[in-house]
Amino acid sequence: MGDGLTPEGKAQLITRNLQEVLGEDKMKEILKERPLRIYWGTATTGKPHVAYFVPMSKIADFLKAGCEVTILFADLHAYLDNMKAPWDLLELRTRYYEQVIQAMLQSIGVPLERLRFIRGTEFQLSKEYTLDVYRLSSVVTQHDAKKAGAEVVKQVEHPLLSGLLYPGLQALDEEYLKVDAQFGGVDQRKIFTFAEKYLPALGYAKRIHLMNPMVPGLTGAKMSSSEEESKIDLLDSPADVKKKLKKAFCEPGNIENNGVLSFVRHVLFPLKSEFVVLRDEKFGGNKTYTDFETLEKDFTEQLVHPGDLKASVEKALNKLLDPIREKFNSPEMKKLSNDAYPGASKQKTVPKGSTKNSGPEEIDPSLLDLRVGKILSVRQHPDADSLYVESVDVGEENPRCVVSGLVQYVPSDQLLGRSVVLLCNLKPQKMRGIESQGMLLCASTEGEQKQVEPLDPPTGSAPGERIYIEGYENGEPEGELKPKKKVFEKLQVDFRISDDLCAQWKGKNFLTKLGSVTCKTLRGGSIS
């Protein structure tokens, strides 16, 4: 592979979709003479998720460019990083990573025989390597070591010495793996510049560094193994993929922190060179895109609906995940997964002051500040065809400005003067330039044609009247929900419309002092 490419063509393939390259001139000089030697390392900690397809797709690019690629399973690093992988599980998690990474590569058509796989402990425990760790520790300052690991090593109030060693070992790996370049996420940049500064101090060459952008998670922040809501696991079922994508942040016209759109850019396009948006015939039918820029432009101009984008990504993603699911469906692989991550599906945060046996923490629905609102005015968002801007009376001195994506589902005349259910303690968020100070709760059902209906408070309810969940009427709402805690997202999973059209959480009705909150027709619908 790469034989038919010029050095310039190889460089273009190596660097496409990267956010930054340090040492590009040196890379181009090497490519004129021989294949570039690159390594990518992954600490064997939490379960790999779909964002790992980003480096996998780049590894495919490296091989197409004729590079010699090494994949390092950094087992010792996993232990040094605040023992994210306990010593007794290190071997099992490393085996899990080996199996799942190889399955990912095979699912995108990467030939494994052209890759070199190695574990960190195969060379990091040698006499020579250990001596270099000591040599490095004699020239590195504590400040530089801590700064280098700030974006990668888990930050705690009282950092362990092991976390300060972590960047130095990653720098030494470049020398001991005999590579020209290290590839990683842009979150590794401080470690890369640390290596460029300190390897020459030991008499070793400064390496090239290739950095891919970090793909936003489903909630808009970085995709993380430790945040269940932010990522899709490689072994998630098709139903789980659908559920998580449905909840994913994908605001109409908004391309910032859009994990769904970023996945198309950094994984699906590099692998297939085209992407098909699946649409109903009445909305123009399927549309094939051969470059990401056109898709991004159409999404920005709201010619591509978030629901259609999610459905299309769901289909493409399941196609990638199916071979991995099949491999891990064997008894041997199921045992490995369970042994490497014992009780992973059952682990919950233990509330302060309780014991491990007190059961999983249940988030109190009274933390939500739900109120009756009355819509005083409705207008079209000036910069978004799918959004309304509403003025809503919630019993305060001034009405609240609320932005909602109901244009396609509810005519404006059906909203004007209507009593609604408003979530009032979300952090205000700008939507296409206008700050929304609440969320209008609606019931919805999926199908050939999505249906959406605003929830209805009991007749006679006054603006500002509190809405609570049956049995939780005495709790106090939070002043403002902290986005990182994802209180609403965790509760919303269990919001449903009952058979008798009542809004419920885990079978308990939404209530005011006048009765139950209802929905007109959408039995079994979800609420968001």
Curated annotation (Swiss-Prot):
Gene Ontology CC entries for this record: cytoplasm; nucleus
Annotated EC: 6.1.1.1
InterPro entries in UniProt: aa-tRNA-synth_Ic, NA-bd_OB-fold, Rossmann-like_a/b/a_fold, tRNA-bd_dom, Tyr-tRNA-ligase, Tyrosine-tRNA_ligase_regulator
Domain tRNA-binding: residue ranges: 364-468
Feature: compositional bias, Polar residues: 346-358
Residue numbers covered by motif Nuclear localization signal: 242-247
Sequence motif 'HIGH' region, location on chain: 44-52
Record flagged with keyword Metal-binding: no
Keyword set, alphabetical order: Aminoacyl-tRNA synthetase, ATP-binding, Cytoplasm, Ligase, Nucleotide-binding, Nucleus, Protein biosynthesis, RNA-binding, tRNA-binding
Entry binding sites for L-tyrosine: 39, 166, 170, 173, 188
Cell location: Cytoplasm; Nucleus
Record field: catalytic activity: tRNA(Tyr) + L-tyrosine + ATP = L-tyrosyl-tRNA(Tyr) + AMP + diphosphate + H(+)
Lineage: superkingdom: Eukaryota
CDD domains listed in its UniProt record: tRNA_bind_EMAP-II_like (cd02799), TyrRS_core (cd00805)
Keyword Magnesium: no
Renumbered residue ranges of the record's region Disordered: 335-364
Biological processes per GO annotation: tyrosyl-tRNA aminoacylation
SUPFAM superfamilies: Nucleic acid-binding proteins (SSF50249), Nucleotidylyl transferase (SSF52374)
Family: Belongs to the class-I aminoacyl-tRNA synthetase family.
Subunit structure: Homodimer.
Function: Catalyzes the attachment of tyrosine to tRNA(Tyr) in a two-step reaction: tyrosine is first activated by ATP to form Tyr-AMP and then transferred to the acceptor end of tRNA(Tyr).
NCBIfam families recorded: PRK08560.1, tyrS
PANTHER family, sorted: TRNA-AMINOACYLATION COFACTOR ARC1 FAMILY MEMBER, TYROSINE--TRNA LIGASE, CYTOPLASMIC
Name the UniProt record assigns to this protein: Tyrosine--tRNA ligase, cytoplasmic
